[in-house]
Design a protein with these regions (language model features):
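Carbohydrate-interacting regions of secretory-pathway proteins
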Residues: 1-225
Length: 225
């Protein structure tokens, strides 16, 4: 689904990545589209679901592969809504390379880069580097729908293909609370789909760390030159 909205000064084009599983590259593993999702009765670590559309679920009580969008993006504004059960873990990767962490971090007071809303660390030479903790723990309880609103500036390259500017998270807002501002990234974060850096790349949803569901993924390409 691609929509254009015109104002007196500009045209804004956006598209949703939760219209069809066909918007995502094969294989999609156990990911499927459902209509309703709730915590399982008596078990906050798993989901129960009802048939329908609009919600992408990796698995009610386990894990599967990561999802990579067919669509490629550079500079972008991204809105994404997600829910995890108790103790579960996922992540949203811009360009398949740079992760904003999804985790059940409800109630934690000592938070780090690996908590929900964190920009995950890089992994070089067997050790972690450069992770960025969210400024505030804005997490909601397990099973509640949460949101990220992200403004991302892609890395820049010269005509020889050499990187001349780092990728940056200009803004990350978690459940309406700003948690990052203008964070520069020296390279892909841990468990990225690609080790290199490029002007364009796909959205990646991590599905191999536990149950997670996503809805209302809205991608708005930008030009941040």
């Amino acid at each position: 689904c691609k929509t254009s909205q015109k104002s007196a000064s500009s045209e804004v084009t956006f598209f949703k990545l939760t219209e069809s599983v066909h918007q995502w590259q094969q294989p999609i593993g156990d990911w499927k589209e459902v209509g309703v999702i709730q915590l399982r009765d008596g078990d906050n670590s798993a989901f129960k679901v009802e048939k329908g559309r609009g919600i992408f679920l990796n698995h009610p009580d386990a894990q599967t592969v990561n999802l990579l969008s067919h669509a490629q993006h550079g500079d972008v504004s991204l809105h994404v809504e997600f829910t995890v059960p108790e103790g579960s873990n996922s992540g949203v990767y811009l360009q398949g390379r740079y992760e904003v962490q999804v985790l059940d971090s409800w109630g934690k007071t000592d938070i780090g880069h690996g908590d929900c809303g964190g920009i995950y660390q890089r992994w070089i030479g067997g050790r972690g580097l450069e992770g960025h903790a969210p400024k505030i723990n804005a997490s909601l309880p397990p099973g509640e729908w949460q949101s990220f609103d992200i403004v991302f500036r892609a890395p820049r390259f010269n005509q020889s293909g050499e990187k001349i500017e780092n990728a940056r998270f200009l803004k990350v807002v978690h459940n309406g609370v700003p948690v990052h501002h203008n964070v520069s990234l020296n390279g892909p974060t841990r468990s990225a789909s690609f080790d290199d850096e490029q002007p364009l790349g796909p959205i990646m949803l991590q599905g191999d760390h536990g149950p997670v569901a996503y809805r209302n993924i809205i991608v708005r390409p930008l030009n941040l030159d």
